[in-house]
Amino acid sequence: MSLSNNLSKILIIDFGSQFTQLIARRVRELGVFSEIVSHKKIKIAQITKDNIAGIILSGGPLNVYENDKFKFDKKILKLGIPILGICFGHQILSKLLGGKVKKSKHREFGLATINKVSNSTLTKNFFNKNNRSDVWMSHADQVSKMPKNFKIIASTKNSKLTIIENIKENFYGVQFHPEVTHTNKGKILLRNFVFLICKIKKNWSSKDQKLKLINEIKDQVGDNKVICGLSGGVDSSVVAQLLSKAIGKNLTCIFVNNGLLRKNEEIQVVNTFKKKLKINLIYVNAEKEFIRKLTNVSDPEKKRKIIGNLFIKIFERYANRIKNVKFLAQGTLYPDLIESKSVTGSQTSKIKSHHNVGGLPKRMKLKLVEPLKFLFKDEVRKLGLELNLSNDIISRHPFPGPGLAIRMPGIITNEKIKILKEADFYFIKALREHGLYDKIWQAYAALLPVKTVGVMGDNRTYEHICLLRAITSEDGMTADFFDFPKGFMQSISNQIINNIRGINRVVYDVTSKPPSTIELE
């Protein structure tokens, strides 16, 4: 595997962490180019001080005792390049340099407070006035003995060697995840590593990102025709605009109404893209086809794979009609990939199949074009601004490709779809009316697979439970529930129950991610 260009960069060696791309994204936010490569594929000949300013070793699901499952050339440690190990990266760096790692007596998952022990360039402005900082932990092993010439920078109650460093060799290890937003000043720590320790200068911007993606599309596609699966959301809209700039008239967008869209969504999408943006768009009404295939299916993985397969069949059907179409473009994002599979070939744990990743058929006639697959939602929104997309497209809440199918656990019926469309409509409408929509990362209504007893007008009811979910997030990797102002939940609960037949109870989901995912299925 060759590194992509001659820009001085931060190299991230991936050991399978769910957060690896988040590290790269944090470095890009600093205005510095970064690149990820699997620990299985990196070769020492590719790394020189001329093209690599610093190396970050990611976390991962392995442990350092599984020597047969990870590869790392120890010669990399002798190149004189600054190295930062994060979580598993911290442990493997310590072990390779002669330290010891063992299972923790007390595992640490979630928020933890670390205490400053010594000063360090790495932790400049990282601790508060009480010499503490809140960080996000996710580990069952810990470094129990430091390598020679290392010193302790910070500790927790359960982990003495939480931050360690060898300033002479420029080796640094942190047991927590500075890349996630829950680590209070994680961005400061990464900034210190990039600029104060690696001494690299800014060399990257969103404009560079746009031009890079357009050129990559041209290189991949050439003069061939491409169809783009358009949903009307920000992801597929940005992909469509990138393709339009890269290949012009060789692009045809296809919008499939799978019967699982939000209320009036198909009308809004067609009006926006066909009439306003003048994009070559084909509208396909496949409601009956999707609902028939999903009849009596309750398993969420099967739902996603049925939907993914059917989307591809429809795209291939229309590709044959257009003729000479070789590629299918879609708005896959990095969080989709890391919940479905490993991107770099490292041992990432699968969370669930996304319809456009793990849900795709193994034998596809069309080749995939996924220009956004290494980006996060907010990065895509910035890219949308660079592409001059309107704010109503850029600010839309995420909506999953399988649509309402994964917002009604259990068997899908036309009656449930109708009820859920109305509940979601009232919820989103209320958010807009109260000026809350743009303060929330994603909000939706779901229908739970149980009914409960209620009383309406002195009569007994036995109807569905509507679950409302609204979360705040920066990138979709971690999320917290939105704390609504007093009175809002009571108001929307009354609206839903009074206006929609079939619901007699409304609940609000206050679970964060992790442990939950944003969608129910």
UniProtKB/Swiss-Prot annotation:
InterPro entries found in the cross-reference section: Class_I_gatase-like (IPR029062), GATASE (IPR017926), GMP_synth_C (IPR001674), GMP_synth_GATase (IPR004739), GMP_synthase (IPR022955), GMPS_ATP_PPase_dom (IPR025777), NAD/GMP_synthase (IPR022310), Rossmann-like_a/b/a_fold (IPR014729)
Database matches in Pfam families: GATase (PF00117), GMP_synt_C (PF00958), NAD_synthase (PF02540)
Domain GMPS ATP-PPase residue range list: 204-396
Protein's pathway: Purine metabolism; GMP biosynthesis; GMP from XMP (L-Gln route): step 1/1
Catalytic-site annotation from UniProt: 87, 177, 179
Enzyme class of the recorded protein, top EC level: ligase
Binding site for ATP: 231-237
Entry keyword annotation includes Ligase: yes
One GO molecular-function entry: GMP synthase activity
Domain of life: Bacteria
Gene Ontology cellular-component terms listed: cytosol
Annotated ranges, domain Glutamine amidotransferase type-1: 9-203
EC number from the UniProt entry: 6.3.5.2
SUPFAM superfamilies per the UniProt record, alphabetical: Adenine nucleotide alpha hydrolases-like, Class I glutamine amidotransferase-like, GMP synthetase C-terminal dimerisation domain
Functional summary from the UniProt entry: Catalyzes the synthesis of GMP from XMP.
Protein's name according to its UniProt entry: GMP synthase [glutamine-hydrolyzing]
Organism of derivation: Pelagibacter ubique (strain HTCC1062)
Source lineage: Bacteria, Pseudomonadati, Pseudomonadota, Alphaproteobacteria, Candidatus Pelagibacterales
